[in-house]
Amino acid sequence: MVMTDPIADMLTRIRNANQMSHLKVLVPASKLKLEILAVLKKEGFIKDFYLPQSSREIIISLKYSPNKERVIKGLKRVSKPGLRVYASAEQIPKVLNGLGVALVSTSKGILTDAQARLSQVGGEVLAYIW
Protein backbone atom coordinates (compact mmCIF):
# COMPACT_ATOMS: atom_id res chain seq x y z
CA MET A 1 0.00 0.00 0.00
CA VAL A 2 1.33 3.42 -0.95
CA MET A 3 1.49 5.98 1.83
CA THR A 4 0.53 9.45 0.57
CA ASP A 5 1.61 11.43 3.65
CA PRO A 6 4.41 9.78 5.65
CA ILE A 7 4.80 12.78 8.00
CA ALA A 8 1.12 12.64 8.98
CA ASP A 9 1.49 8.90 9.52
CA MET A 10 4.46 9.47 11.86
CA LEU A 11 2.62 12.18 13.81
CA THR A 12 -0.46 9.94 14.11
CA ARG A 13 1.63 7.03 15.40
CA ILE A 14 3.26 9.31 17.99
CA ARG A 15 -0.14 10.77 18.99
CA ASN A 16 -1.74 7.32 19.36
CA ALA A 17 1.17 5.85 21.34
CA ASN A 18 1.26 8.96 23.52
CA GLN A 19 -2.45 8.71 24.33
CA MET A 20 -2.02 5.06 25.30
CA SER A 21 1.07 5.92 27.44
CA HIS A 22 3.38 3.66 25.44
CA LEU A 23 7.09 4.13 26.09
CA LYS A 24 8.22 3.51 22.50
CA VAL A 25 6.80 3.70 19.01
CA LEU A 26 8.15 2.43 15.66
CA VAL A 27 7.89 4.46 12.44
CA PRO A 28 9.28 3.78 8.95
CA ALA A 29 12.55 5.64 8.44
CA SER A 30 13.29 8.62 6.18
CA LYS A 31 15.74 11.51 6.29
CA LEU A 32 12.94 14.06 6.74
CA LYS A 33 11.48 12.15 9.69
CA LEU A 34 14.94 11.99 11.31
CA GLU A 35 15.27 15.78 10.96
CA ILE A 36 11.81 16.33 12.47
CA LEU A 37 12.59 13.98 15.36
CA ALA A 38 15.89 15.78 16.02
CA VAL A 39 13.95 19.05 16.44
CA LEU A 40 11.35 17.36 18.68
CA LYS A 41 14.13 15.94 20.87
CA LYS A 42 15.91 19.30 21.07
CA GLU A 43 12.64 21.01 22.07
CA GLY A 44 12.00 18.37 24.76
CA PHE A 45 8.91 16.71 23.28
CA ILE A 46 10.46 13.23 22.98
CA LYS A 47 13.07 11.49 25.10
CA ASP A 48 15.16 9.98 22.30
CA PHE A 49 15.10 8.24 18.93
CA TYR A 50 17.43 5.92 17.10
CA LEU A 51 17.70 4.00 13.85
CA PRO A 52 19.17 0.50 14.25
CA GLN A 53 21.62 -0.30 11.43
CA SER A 54 19.85 -3.48 10.35
CA SER A 55 16.38 -1.92 10.43
CA ARG A 56 14.36 0.46 8.29
CA GLU A 57 12.30 1.66 11.25
CA ILE A 58 13.02 4.46 13.70
CA ILE A 59 12.45 3.67 17.37
CA ILE A 60 11.09 6.72 19.22
CA SER A 61 11.15 6.89 23.03
CA LEU A 62 8.29 9.05 24.23
CA LYS A 63 8.68 11.42 27.16
CA TYR A 64 6.44 11.68 30.21
CA SER A 65 6.63 13.83 33.35
CA PRO A 66 7.56 12.22 36.70
CA ASN A 67 3.86 11.89 37.59
CA LYS A 68 3.15 10.12 34.24
CA GLU A 69 1.61 13.13 32.47
CA ARG A 70 2.13 13.39 28.72
CA VAL A 71 4.66 15.96 27.54
CA ILE A 72 3.01 16.15 24.10
CA LYS A 73 -0.49 17.52 24.58
CA GLY A 74 -1.32 17.80 20.89
CA LEU A 75 -0.01 17.32 17.35
CA LYS A 76 -1.52 18.80 14.21
CA ARG A 77 -0.40 18.35 10.62
CA VAL A 78 -0.70 21.71 8.83
CA SER A 79 0.69 21.43 5.29
CA LYS A 80 -0.70 18.37 3.53
CA PRO A 81 -0.01 16.88 0.08
CA GLY A 82 -3.35 18.22 -1.20
CA LEU A 83 -2.96 21.69 0.33
CA ARG A 84 0.54 22.97 0.97
CA VAL A 85 0.88 25.82 3.48
CA TYR A 86 3.79 28.23 3.06
CA ALA A 87 4.68 31.23 5.20
CA SER A 88 7.30 33.96 5.07
CA ALA A 89 9.40 34.65 8.17
CA GLU A 90 6.97 37.37 9.29
CA GLN A 91 3.88 35.22 8.68
CA ILE A 92 4.97 32.09 10.58
CA PRO A 93 2.33 31.61 13.30
CA LYS A 94 2.99 31.23 17.01
CA VAL A 95 1.44 28.09 18.47
CA LEU A 96 -0.59 28.81 21.63
CA ASN A 97 1.12 32.21 21.99
CA GLY A 98 4.57 30.61 22.08
CA LEU A 99 3.77 27.64 24.34
CA GLY A 100 3.83 25.27 21.37
CA VAL A 101 6.14 24.83 18.40
CA ALA A 102 5.52 25.07 14.66
CA LEU A 103 7.81 22.92 12.52
CA VAL A 104 8.90 24.72 9.36
CA SER A 105 10.72 23.13 6.41
CA THR A 106 13.14 25.80 5.15
CA SER A 107 16.16 26.00 2.89
CA LYS A 108 18.22 25.66 6.11
CA GLY A 109 16.49 22.41 7.09
CA ILE A 110 13.68 21.75 9.56
CA LEU A 111 13.43 24.64 12.04
CA THR A 112 11.06 25.68 14.80
CA ASP A 113 8.95 28.80 14.29
CA ALA A 114 11.23 30.82 16.59
CA GLN A 115 14.40 29.68 14.81
CA ALA A 116 12.89 30.49 11.40
CA ARG A 117 11.91 33.99 12.56
CA LEU A 118 15.42 34.59 13.97
CA SER A 119 17.04 33.34 10.75
CA GLN A 120 14.57 35.42 8.68
CA VAL A 121 13.60 32.42 6.52
CA GLY A 122 10.17 31.21 5.57
CA GLY A 123 9.07 27.85 4.27
CA GLU A 124 6.47 25.13 4.45
CA VAL A 125 4.67 24.91 7.81
CA LEU A 126 4.67 21.15 8.45
CA ALA A 127 3.03 20.74 11.85
CA TYR A 128 2.10 22.25 15.20
CA ILE A 129 3.13 20.56 18.45
CA TRP A 130 2.09 21.67 21.92
Swiss-Prot record:
The lineage of its organism: Bacteria, Bacillati, Mycoplasmatota, Mollicutes, Acholeplasmatales. It comes from the Bacteria. One of its GO terms (biological process) is translation. Belongs to the universal ribosomal protein uS8 family. Part of the 30S ribosomal subunit. Contacts proteins S5 and S12. One of the primary rRNA binding proteins, it binds directly to 16S rRNA central domain where it helps coordinate assembly of the platform of the 30S subunit. Signal peptide: none annotated. GO terms for molecular function: rRNA binding; structural constituent of ribosome. InterPro entries: Ribosomal_uS8, Ribosomal_uS8_CS, Ribosomal_uS8_sf. Keywords: Ribonucleoprotein, Ribosomal protein, RNA-binding, rRNA-binding. One of its GO terms (cellular component) is ribosome. This is Small ribosomal subunit protein uS8.
